[in-house]
């Protein structure tokens, strides 16, 4: 039996965005690759007739985000003017949507799980994000799991909770996307429970897999290590076990593909946070000498306007990124002294390392030292904590456009050999 279904995400056509020219494939090329992939897999399967089968279903009620009194009054007045005619413009269309939601404040969702041996199949009557599918796959007790969207209904787009801060058409309260803000979390929880019921074992807890780079970081014994691989959370966990957890604030996109090198296909092993007005903030113990290292993905778009991005505020030391006339590079600016360097290319990962010691500052990009600046020590007192803000400035006025991954804090100055070795470890 073969199934061609609406998968987890509605983006059925495009292939892997990380592959060159993937979006220029013809329909014929795309279909041939899909058929070849499936046919190749079928030849390796062992066919059995004695596998366990199972089915589970539950129904949950979710609220819709009903309009307030002002919006409802506007809607009714406009519908009255329409005098029974069909809408002819966007306001009239939305007026009908507002009226319908106000009259239908609840929605019942049919959620299902199917077991075919070691395969788990989930069915959701909504169109959900790819992240929702990744949550289900990583939590599922089954060896293999896939999801079918728009099954048994069409209850609209269901974005993860954090997407409601970012906005977009999937968050507009209409028939197409009107369920409560917590809908995705409730759906994931209930469908995961069905998978547990079918398999007879509890869910798995997602932990970001280790790479050669992350293993090298752990071996270097950081004081704090925020890998930024969370699927959804207000906390960025400190992976060292030292308890220096950071806090997510504002607009961020979780669990995006993390750092990789341009000469490698994206394996999606590392996961990162995409910043859209939000921040990651951490309070760490004071250190007279310290090092902060992280992977940076410059997301500045091509524009004639000056775009000032603040990557981080590290206890008063600021790293900014500004676009230049040459779109192929952006200018990296280090403060308190305004020293600028070029060489940060858009849409690629760079390893940034800032070293602070009694002699001054060092700034490294990948395995090359870009700056060695003699300066007096920071003003922090020994008993004070240090505040690190990533994704923008500490005042909430200047944002960062791009992704960060694998932030490590060391309460000592890394040597040049250690920095180079950490960078080289990422290629293994």
Which residue ranges define each predicted feature?
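Non-catalytic substrate/cofactor recognition surfaces at enzyme active-site rims
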Residues: 1-213
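Extracellular/periplasmic catalytic domains that process cell-envelope and extracellular macromolecules
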Residues: 114-115, 141, 216-221, 265-267, ...
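Extracytoplasmic low-complexity segments
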Residues: 207-278, 309, 315, 374, ...
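Extracellular glycan-interaction surfaces
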Residues: 247-277, 292-302, 316-378, 394
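Structural motif
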Residues: 279, 360-362, 403, 413
């Amino acid at each position: 039996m073969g199934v061609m279904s609406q998968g987890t995400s509605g983006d059925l056509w495009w292939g892997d965005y990380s592959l060159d020219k993937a979006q220029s494939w013809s329909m014929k090329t795309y279909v041939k690759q899909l058929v070849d992939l499936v046919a190749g897999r079928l030849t390796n399967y062992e066919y059995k007739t004695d596998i366990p089968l199972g089915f589970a279903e539950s129904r949950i009620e979710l609220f819709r985000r009903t309009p307030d009194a002002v919006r409802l009054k506007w809607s009714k007045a406009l519908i009255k003017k329409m005098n029974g005619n069909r809408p002819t413009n966007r306001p009239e269309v939305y007026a009908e949507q507002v009226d319908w939601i106000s009259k239908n404040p609840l929605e019942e969702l049919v959620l299902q799980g199917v077991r075919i041996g070691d395969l788990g199949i989930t069915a959701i009557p909504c169109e959900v994000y790819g992240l929702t599918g990744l949550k289900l796959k990583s939590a599922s007790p089954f060896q293999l799991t896939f999801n079918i969207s728009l099954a048994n209904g069409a209850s609209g787009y269901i974005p993860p909770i954090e997407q409601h801060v970012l906005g977009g058409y999937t968050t507009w309260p209409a028939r197409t996307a009107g369920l409560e803000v917590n809908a995705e979390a409730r759906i994931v929880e209930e469908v995961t429970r069905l998978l547990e019921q079918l398999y007879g074992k509890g869910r798995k807890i997602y932990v970001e897999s280790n790479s050669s780079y992350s293993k090298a970081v752990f071996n270097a014994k950081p004081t704090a290590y925020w890998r930024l691989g969370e699927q959804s959370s207000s906390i960025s966990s400190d992976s060292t076990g030292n308890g220096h957890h950071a806090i997510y604030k504002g607009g961020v996109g979780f669990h995006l593909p993390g750092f990789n090198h341009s000469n490698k296909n994206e394996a999606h092993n590392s996961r990162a946070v995409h910043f859209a007005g939000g921040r990651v903030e951490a309070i760490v113990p004071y250190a007279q000498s310290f090092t902060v290292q992280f992977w940076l993905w410059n997301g500045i778009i091509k524009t004639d306007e000056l775009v000032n991005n603040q990557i981080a505020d590290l206890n008063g030391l600021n790293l900014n990124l500004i676009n230049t006339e040459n779109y192929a590079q952006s200018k990296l600016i280090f403060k308190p002294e305004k020293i600028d360097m070029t060489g940060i290319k858009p849409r690629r990962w760079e390893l940034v390392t800032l070293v602070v010691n009694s002699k001054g500052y060092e700034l490294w990009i990948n395995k090359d030292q870009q700056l060695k600046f003699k300066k007096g020590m920071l003003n922090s007192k020994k008993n004070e904590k240090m505040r690190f803000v990533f994704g923008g400035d500490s005042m909430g006025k200047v944002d960062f456009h791009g992704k960060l991954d694998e932030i490590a804090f060391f309460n000592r100055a890394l040597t040049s050999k250690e920095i180079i070795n950490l960078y080289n470890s990422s290629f293994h």
